[in-house]
Design a protein with these regions (language model features):
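N-terminal secretory/targeting leader peptides
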Residues: 21-121, 137-140, 144-361
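Cleavable N-terminal signal peptides
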Residues: 7-8, 18
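Conserved small/polar residues in nucleotide/adenosyl-binding loops
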Residues: 1-6
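Sec/Tat signal peptide C-region and signal peptidase I cleavage site
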Residues: 13-20
Length: 361
C-alpha cells in the first residue's frame, strides 16, 4: 500500500503550487536477501538507488519498508501480496505460481538449456517482447506490472551419496520447487515438493536423499551441502525464473518522475542481479569442492557425461510438448509457438540441446 504525505509550497498568491510528497513503499520477497542474488540485489541495488535518485532528482521523498525472508509474504504468497497491495513492489519465483503463471515457466519446461544465467535472461527477454501476453496477464489478472526479471544459476543435483549414472537415481527421493520435479520424476526418481526455506530440514530428516537446486544456494547461505555433500553438474540450465512487479494502484498514485525512476532502476537492478547470479555460480562450485575436501571428500563436484545427459533428455522428451499443450488449453496462449521460439532463440546463441524437443504439430 503506497502511502503519501503532502505539503504545499505556495509561490505568489496561489498562482502556482508545488507538491512535496513523501511516499512510503513496501518492498519485499519471500526469499532471504543474503543467499539469493535476486533478493540481495533488491536490497543493495534497487532500494538504495531509488531512494538516492528520488531525493536528488525530484521534490519528493520516498520511505521504503523492506520485508525480505517472508516478513510480509512467503515465497508462494508474493504475487498475491502485490496484487492486493500488501507489498507495493515484490520479487518472486514464478515457479511457485504454476496455477496462475504456468506460461512464465516455459524455460523450466525446456531443460538442458544454457548454463549461463545472463544468456538465458537475455533470451527470455526477447521472448517476452515476442509474446506480450505474458506481461499483460500480470496486469489484466493480477493488478501488477512487470518491471524486472532475474533468475537462478545452472541447476544440478546435490545428493547424500555419490552416483555416476542417471539410472542410479531411480527410486531415490529428490526435492524440487515443483514445476521442475518432472526432470527427475519422469526418470524414475520419487518427487518431493519443497522450497528453499524448508529444503534443509527435509534433507536433514531424511524426507529426501537429493535436491534439485543451483550451486550458489547449495554452497551458500542455505548450506544444503551439510546434508548432501555430493554435487553433480547436470546441465539442466540456468533459469530466468524470478520477476519483480509493482502494484498498479501504487504505480498510478506515484508522480511520473518517481515512477520513471523506479522503472529505470528496476532495469539496473535486474542486470546487476543476473551478473551477480552468474558469478555466484562459479563461486558456488569452487566452494563445494573446498567444503567437500574439509569433509574428506575428494569428488564432491562431478559432471554428468554428455552421453548420460542425452539419455536423460531422451527419457523426458515428450514432457515439453505436454506442458505446451497445457499452456494452450488453460491459458489461451500458443504454448508450442512460445517454447519453440525460446529454443530457436537459444540456438542462435550457439547452444545445442542434447535432444531437440518436438513441440506442437
Amino acid at each position: 500500500m503506497c502511502i503519501r504525505d503532502s505539503s504545499i509550497l505556495a509561490t505568489g498568491i496561489m498562482a502556482s503550487a508545488s507538491f512535496a510528497d513523501t511516499f512510503t513503499l513496501r518492498v519485499g520477497s519471500g526469499h532471504p536477501s543474503k543467499p539469493t542474488a535476486y533478493v540481495g540485489n533488491m536490497e543493495k541495488v534497487l532500494v538504495p538507488n531509488i531512494k538516492k535518485r528520488v531525493a536528488a532528482e525530484t521534490n519528493h521523498k520516498v520511505r521504503i519498508i523492506e520485508a525480505y525472508a517472508g516478513k510480509i509474504a512467503k515465497v508462494h504468497e508474493t504475487l498475491e501480496a502485490v496484487e492486493k497491495g500488501l507489498l507495493d513492489i515484490g520479487s518472486y519465483c514464478v515457479c511457485f505460481e504454476t496455477a496462475k503463471l504456468l506460461p512464465w515457466n516455459f524455460d523450466y519446461f525446456v531443460p538442458f538449456t544454457t548454463t549461463n544465467l545472463e544468456t538465458n535472461w537475455a533470451v527470455k527477454h526477447k521472448i517476452l517482447k515476442q509474446f506480450p501476453a505474458l506481461t499483460k496477464m500480470l496486469e489484466d489478472k493480477y493488478n501488477q506490472k512487470f518491471i524486472a526479471m532475474q533468475g537462478f544459476d545452472d541447476y544440478g543435483i546435490g545428493t547424500v551419496k555419490q552416483w555416476q549414472k542417471a539410472s542410479e537415481l531411480k527410486g531415490v527421493k529428490v526435492i524440487a520447487a515443483g514445476p521442475n520435479l518432472p526432470w527427475v520424476s519422469l526418470f524414475g526418481s520419487i518427487p518431493v515438493t519443497s522450497t528453499l526455506p524448508t529444503m534443509y530440514n527435509d534433507l536433514a530428516t531424511g524426507v529426501a536423499k537429493g535436491v534439485i537446486i543451483f550451486p550458489s544456494a547449495h554452497a551458500g547461505g542455505f548450506k544444503f551441502y551439510e546434508q548432501a555433500p555430493y554435487w553433480k553438474v547436470i546441465g539442466f540450465g540456468a533459469m530466468a525464473q524470478t520477476i519483480t512487479t509493482i502494484n498498479l494502484d501504487t504505480l498510478k498514485k506515484l508522480p511520473p518522475e518517481v515512477a520513471k525512476i523506479i522503472m529505470e532502476e528496476a532495469k539496473n537492478y535486474e542486470k546487476a542481479a543476473v551478473k551477480d547470479g552468474q558469478q555466484r555460480y562459479q563461486k558456488g562450485l569452487t566452494d563445494l569442492v573446498k567444503l567437500g575436501k574439509k569433509k574428506g571428500i575428494n569428488d564432491a563436484v562431478t559432471y554428468l557425461p554428455l552421453d548420460q545427459q542425452k539419455i536423460w533428455a531422451e527419457t523426458i522428451k515428450d514432457w515439453p510438448n505436454s506442458r505446451a499443450k497445457d499452456i494452450t488449453k488453460d491459458y489461451g496462449m500458443d504454448g508450442a509457438a512460445l517454447m519453440n521460439a525460446y529454443m530457436d532463440e537459444m540456438e542462435k546463441t550457439g547452444h545445442k540441446f542434447p535432444v531437440r524437443y518436438k513441440i506442437g504439430g
